[in-house]
Design a protein with these regions (language model features):
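Short glycine-enriched nucleophile-adjacent loop
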Residues: 230-242
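Alpha/beta-hydrolase fold nucleophile elbow
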Residues: 215-226
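Substrate-access "cap/lid" subdomains that shape
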Residues: 113, 209, 243, 252-361, ...
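Alpha/beta-hydrolase active-site loop
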Residues: 192-212, 269
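Non-catalytic accessory segments of hydrolases
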Residues: 27-193, 446-459, 467-477, 496, ...
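Mobile gating loops/cap/lid regions near enzyme active sites that modulate substrate access
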Residues: 396-399, 403-513
Length: 513
């Protein structure tokens, strides 16, 4: 057994010891809710509807100073009460997540100053829980992993709060993980790679050991994520670090690592270059740990400008990459709900780009004429670029994932989200558009209608039944067939319809299906 494996097992054993020593304390209606975990009493908040929230619960010690670029270490309380009524700082980032929200607000004529961003810190490994402590029995658990290209976002963005899911008998947990080079650096002197994946694994283990005190069932954990959060959820599910704790997976608008896993040697070369620039030609990791985080982020923006920070092959955390699994046709048959939005790429297309450029850069020469002919029915060139970009980065690898699950005797359900909000024609069913429906958290500034309210109810039916029963069902929406050779897909728009995936032929052309 390696020293690194021994250290990891020791961390899990600490969690087990904590679980045996845990004690839950339910408050009366007039008191703040309290839950005791090991030697710490977490004091939460109860809202007017009876939903309790526990915010900013630490699951690991601050990965700062000498702990920067090391595996996470379990948090240990000091035996006193812990105020869990406020969210903790978000992980270090440049603010791209907040900029996304501000851009959306400008589109609908709302002053972005109305939304303030979080505080950022390297001390950021916290989780948040929404629950009903007075509900009977143990309820299934949803762990949600936020997106943001692995460089931005935070666990308590407005769309991720869990009150509505709690009302449907789900305990909701949202988790943080180190972002950018703080979570994804590869350097020859590091003891481990994919540190953000270790963060997520530690948060999963914390939930497994302690969620029972918050009313959750540790044996019914579904992990969900959107965009890079979806790919991280999938990586966590297939990683040995998860120890089989993931019972189901919801994969929203991810998929690209099935086609393109970052090269480990290239990732390491970038890490060395980051150190060289930060240390005036030196490359030592210990010295790099002393460089201020703001300086690290500024340099990382240059060094990694054209490099996607995603999990890389690693003997302990990811011995087999998703790309290798796709190539071999073998993957763990975890039940999965998988989908994409119709216009994932539209709002990100750069002015001046052309379809020819995209075809030449991303599509094999032998396929270009057939793909061009297919796209001719999509509308103008902007629509064609969106359709192709969405298919390449999100749709086709997601369908490939569903087919892998089906091939390995698992169950997968596939959706496409097509709903365009009033006044949003310019960006369509954009990347992230489904999230307010999934959590029933429509921002006040988002234009909505009764159609959106009705669609939210149907989507909540399907998502919560998948979490609670392992299969998406809705009396309002009708039966949702599993993915098979007929490629039946739930299409969410004004309502829900079921048909063979509208763009299956495009994926066949691109992926030689």
């Amino acid at each position: 057994m390696t020293n690194t494996t021994t250290a990891l097992i020791s961390s899990w054993c600490y969690f087990c010891f904590c679980a045996l020593a845990s004690l839950a304390v339910h408050a009366t209606a007039s008191e703040a809710p309290q839950v005791r975990v090991f030697n710490t009493s977490f004091i939460g908040h109860r809202d007017s509807t009876g939903v309790e929230s526990f915010r900013g619960i630490p699951f690991a010690q601050a990965p700062m100073g000498e702990r920067r670029w090391r595996r996470p270490v379990p948090w240990q309380g000091d035996g006193g009460p812990y105020d869990a009524t406020a969210f903790a700082p978000a992980c270090m980032q440049t603010g791209s997540g907040l900029a996304w929200y501000h851009g959306m607000m400008r589109r609908v004529g709302v002053d972005p100053a109305l939304m303030e961003g979080p505080v950022y810190s390297e001390d950021c490994l916290y989780l948040n829980i929404w629950t009903d402590l007075d509900a009977e029995g143990k309820r299934p658990v949803l762990i949600f992993i936020h997106g943001g290209s692995n460089t931005g976002g935070w666990s308590y963005e407005p769309n991720y709060h869990g009150e509505s899911l709690v009302k449907r008998d789900v305990v909701v947990v949202t988790v943080a993980y180190r972002l950018g080079v703080f979570g994804w650096l590869s350097h020859p002197e590091m003891e481990a790679r994919n540190l953000a994946l270790y963060d997520l694994a530690m948060s999963l283990e914390w939930v497994y050991q302690h969620i029972g005190k918050f009313g959750g069932d540790p044996n019914r954990i579904t992990v969900s994520g959107e965009s890079s959060g979806a790919t991280n959820a999938l990586h966590l599910a297939v990683s040995p670090l998860s120890q089989g704790r993931v019972g189901g997976l919801i994969h929203q608008s991810g998929g690209w690592p099935l086609d393109d896993t970052p090269d480990r040697s290239e990732a390491t070369a970038r890490g060395i270059e980051l150190a060289r620039r930060a240390l005036d030609g030196q490359t030592g990791l210990e010295a790099l740990r002393q460089v201020p985080s703001e300086r690290i982020m500024a340099l990382a923006g240059e060094v990694y400008a054209d490099f996607q920070l995603d999990p890389i092959e690693d003997p302990e955390s990811l011995p087999v990459t998703l790309e290798s699994m796709a190539a071999s046709g073998s993957i763990a048959a975890i039940p999965m709900l998988i989908g994409t939005n119709a216009d994932e790429r539209l709002m990100y297309l750069k002015a001046g780009g052309t379809l020819d450029q995209l075809l030449q850069r991303r599509v094999a020469i032998a396929q270009q004429d057939d793909v061009r002919a297919y796209l001719s029915g999509a509308g103008d060139e902007l629509a064609q670029r969106n359709q192709l970009g969405t298919a390449l980065d999100f749709l086709c690898p997601s369908l490939e994932l569903a087919s892998l699950i089906e091939k390995n005797d698992g169950a997968a359900w596939v959706y496409r989200f097509d709903r365009v909000r009033p006044g949003f024609d310019a960006i369509g069913a954009y990347h992230g558009a489904e999230l307010p429906y999934v959590f029933d958290r429509h921002d006040d500034w988002l234009p909505s209608s009764k159609v959106d309210d009705d669609l939210t109810a149907v989507i909540l039916d399907y998502w919560t039944s998948f979490i609670t029963k392992g299969r998406p069902r809705s009396d309002q929406g009708g039966p949702w067939p599993t993915w098979s050779s007929t490629q039946q897909t739930a299409v969410f728009n004004d309502g829900v319809s079921f048909k063979a995936h509208p763009d299956r032929e495009l994926c066949r052309l691109l992926m030689d299906r």
